[in-house]
């Protein structure tokens, strides 16, 4: 009996189908979509352009680590939809997202190659990083993939990891930088500045009373940088972009115990409750601190806003991945 592995395909056009003569494909988790991923995608596109074949990515939802290590608290850099959006912005024709199941994770490397890659996608070309592993317990290596690809007359390109400051760019390296609050260095490794998104929820309205109203972000499903005050840009559901002073952490002046994300949108007037808000982080300005009183806090908030104004003017223009309009379709695998 033929096993099927269903999922969702994302594209910036309707009705994506793979031609009978195959496609170019790259497989990975692509968390964050960083400079190394961009290099792999660029090499893949160059492989298939002359053949007139589509270039696609294959990824997984949920992340395999969530099934393999369910008790391990780990926050990822991008949602599935955001990963697809970023990958498509690099020029891919489609992003296929397989439903991650135990059955899928238990496939041997050769079973994954034959039953998923070859049977479903009929690849004419594959591009992967030199450290690529696949199959049950990551047992498959690039050497295995090369051997089978040679047998099946599939062009395989191995891409050397991109290095910045002498160290390979990786999702785990970016994760560490963000957990340290070093968003500027993290952004140097990413294709686009780091972003979180969530729904604006009711807060304590302390910012409004101080003259600096904030949107309180809830339902954030990706990694939130280390506590501190940041300069960034916020994008509303309508697509309007504003310079933003972002406070991450507990409000120590008011002895708050809950960690929150509070965003002051420079020049914005209106009500954002219930709306989706996207927040990009550009630079960490300072640590959170407890002030002696409300006036001292107000003075610092004013200084933060002035600082953000001096940094954000060049970054409030076009939104990230402008022009990528996602459509999604279920596929049976």
Task: Report residues per predicted region.
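Short acidic-hydrophobic, aromatic-tinged amphipathic segments that line or gate anion-handling sites
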Residues: 2-15, 96
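Glycine-rich, highly charged phosphate/nucleotide-binding loops
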Residues: 75-83, 107-113
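A conserved beta-strand->alpha-helix junction
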Residues: 58-61, 90, 95-103, 160
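Classical nucleotidyltransferase
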Residues: 103-213, 288, 292-298
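N-terminal catalytic cores of NTP/NDP-binding nucleotidyl/phosphoryl-transfer enzymes
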Residues: 16-79
């Amino acid at each position: 009996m033929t096993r099927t592995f269903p999922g969702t395909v994302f594209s910036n056009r309707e009705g994506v189908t793979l031609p009978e003569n195959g496609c170019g494909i790259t497989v990975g988790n692509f968390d964050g979509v960083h400079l190394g991923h961009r290099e792999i995608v660029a090499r893949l596109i160059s492989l298939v352009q002359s053949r007139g074949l589509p270039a696609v990515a294959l990824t997984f939802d949920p992340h395999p680590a969530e099934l393999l290590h369910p008790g391990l608290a780990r926050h990822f850099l991008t949602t599935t939809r955001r990963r697809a959006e970023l990958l498509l912005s690099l020029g891919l024709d489609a992003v296929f997202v397989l439903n991650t199941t135990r059955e899928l994770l238990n496939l041997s490397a050769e079973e994954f190659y034959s039953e998923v890659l070859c049977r479903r996608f009929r690849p004419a070309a594959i591009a992967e990083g030199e450290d690529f592993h696949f199959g049950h317990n990551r047992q498959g290596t690039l050497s295995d993939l090369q051997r089978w690809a040679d047998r099946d007359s599939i062009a395989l390109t191995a891409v050397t990891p991109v290095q910045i400051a002498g160290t390979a760019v990786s999702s785990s390296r970016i994760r560490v930088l963000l957990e340290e609050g070093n968003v500027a260095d993290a952004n140097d490794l990413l294709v686009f500045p780091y972003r979180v998104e969530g729904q604006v929820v009711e807060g304590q309205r302390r910012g409004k009373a101080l003259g600096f109203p904030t949107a309180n972000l809830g339902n954030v499903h990706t990694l939130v940088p280390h506590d501190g005050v940041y300069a960034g840009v916020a994008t509303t559901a309508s697509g309007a972009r504003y310079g933003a002073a972002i406070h991450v952490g507990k409000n120590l002046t008011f002895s708050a115990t809950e960690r929150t994300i509070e965003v002051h949108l420079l020049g914005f007037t209106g009500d954002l409750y219930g709306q989706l808000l996207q927040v990009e982080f550009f630079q960490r300005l300072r640590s959170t601190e407890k002030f002696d009183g409300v006036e001292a806090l107000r003075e610092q908030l004013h200084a933060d806003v002035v600082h953000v104004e001096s940094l954000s003017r060049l970054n409030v223009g076009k939104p990230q991945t402008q022009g990528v309009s996602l459509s999604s379709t279920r596929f049976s695998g």
